[in-house]
């Protein structure tokens, strides 16, 4: 089957979040299953630095000016890039400037991504021909599905929601400029509160919709989590067109037995390396080398969505226990300030790195005892999966993919050897604190802790399973 993925980022070429991790792994897993898979992304400066030499496929005039599509194989996978310096040759973040203001021409930049994705799926690259499946991701790829529909294309489309909180909304007057028919601007189309939504374009016009966990697929059909799209998603669910497919872990990148970003590798049958990683992490963040302190870690965006405020609200109570906390992340200036204030009060227990560092994230997860993922909502979540893989027990809220991947450590689950972490139900600092205290109590029971950790290490969230689920969805429509 010929599959073309349309996305705005792909690890290791460029990454701002979990979408990149998915796109750096899923296409490879699908290729290993015998599919002919290619990916289309913009040629950002970061991509140009890493991708190497490319060959011109086509240069065409578009609503966004003259652009060139180029092609190369990257780590064995076919990758198309959009060479349009006037749109994508910008340093830093692919979506906004250094002041966090969205680029004013984002409507055009990502409409072009969708347009060229649709063109490629229709056979613009004569050497590859037509795709069987166009698979678009998040709002940045959503218009690809609308373009295919406007051309009455036989190519089937799948649209994946990685986070429904980002609808990709723009002024309706752009519709004509982008070459889409005006009759698409209605409730049964891509109109959304008087504007156009690229996310809704994907939801409305795709043949199938997927999202990144079964629980999130249910949650987004409800008003509280549906981002205003819940009515449409209820309809798509009733039609059998909405599916939840859990993300996986890329074993070539996240594997404590082979990870080159950590000071000592380890495996379930030989865990001494994890202790060495903990000691290294404590040294890196100038914390006392205390093997008996429960070392909590957090690799996250510092936002309310991620629940960082639950931790900060009760930070002084947490620090009354024999615990340490290491945080890697950035985001809300207010939350960054509160975190720094907490460190100034507890310098022997808290370490902070404001920003993002991929290699450091591996060392932090390998060195931690508990990874905190207390999100208000979480479509799938990847850091809890990395925690399981590295024997760093996740403490999570019961939402989205967190609910699908972590089993709470209660008396019954511990006895049945199914417990893999700690789960709290309600988005509040009180509920978080209760789960934290349960984690501390288990930490003090060394044999039980080791048993739960072995359960966590035994979990299999590889990409082969997810690729098989997508294959079954594709087969329903081709």
Curated annotation (Swiss-Prot):
Gene Ontology molecular function, alphabetical: alpha-1,4-glucan glucosyltransferase (ADP-glucose donor) activity; alpha-1,4-glucan glucosyltransferase (UDP-glucose donor) activity
The protein's enzyme class: transferase
Binding site residues for ADP-alpha-D-glucose: 15
Pfam families associated with the record: Glyco_transf_5, Glycos_transf_1
Gene3D superfamilies per record: Glycogen Phosphorylase B
Keywords assigned by UniProt, alphabetized: Glycogen biosynthesis, Glycosyltransferase, Transferase
GO biological process, any: glycogen biosynthetic process
Catalytic reaction(s) noted: [(1->4)-alpha-D-glucosyl](n) + ADP-alpha-D-glucose = [(1->4)-alpha-D-glucosyl](n+1) + ADP + H(+)
Gene Ontology CC annotation, any one: cytosol
EC number: 2.4.1.21
Pathway this chain belongs to: Glycan biosynthesis; glycogen biosynthesis
Matches recorded under NCBIfam families: glgA, PRK00654.1-2
Protein family membership: Belongs to the glycosyltransferase 1 family. Bacterial/plant glycogen synthase subfamily.
Function: Synthesizes alpha-1,4-glucan chains using ADP-glucose.
Name recorded for this polypeptide: Glycogen synthase
Organism of origin: Actinobacillus pleuropneumoniae serotype 5b (strain L20)
Gene that produces this protein: glgA
